[in-house]
Amino acid sequence: MGKAIKTEKGRRAIGAVKITVIVVCLATVIISATFFAVKSILKAEFPMKYQDKISLYAETYGVPEDLLYGVIHTESGYDEKAKSHAGAIGLTQITPETFLWLQTKTGENLPEEALYDADTSVKYCAVFYGLLLKEFGGDEKTAIAAYHAGRGQVNAWLRDPDISPDGKTLVNIPESETKKYVEKVQRAVSIYDKLYKKELNKI
């Protein structure tokens, strides 16, 4: 009788272990499927378009690839023909005035319509960020703020100890639109970095 009870208990224990293993396996499959589904959705929303151009100009001008992807995603959503109410043009939403200034650095003489060309737009975004990162000591947050608000405005903020105690980085950004823009770009950069870590050149 005692042996029969022990045998029955043993069978129940084995059965419970089997059920636990099955449940764990099913949970793992569901979690994995959910992860890949979410990753696929994010990759559709944050694609690696213009990869050859971005890789080329990121390396040429010393700019992280994920930063260029994040900027393009935020600025135009990869719309080559985008034009803002302020007159910013193309994938990277560079204004004609900024384009003229950047061309004094490259020695080119292109019309503003050239910014509708993807290659030109990506190149000059990389040129601009290369200059901004150099000017602001490699600090991406400050460079992103300058891309949006302008170098003059950011330099004025850096001279304010309440905004920049060290005079080099922005502890806070007083202009709400620029603050939101910086946060949006940084979020996009972070997502690109997580989704495509192996493919991206960080510089």
Identify the residue ranges that each predicted region occupies.
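N-terminal Lys/Arg-rich, disordered targeting/topogenic segments
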Residues: 1-16
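Catalytic glycan-binding domains that act on GlcNAc-containing polysaccharides
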Residues: 33-203
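Hydrophobic membrane-insertion alpha-helices, especially the h-region
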Residues: 18-36
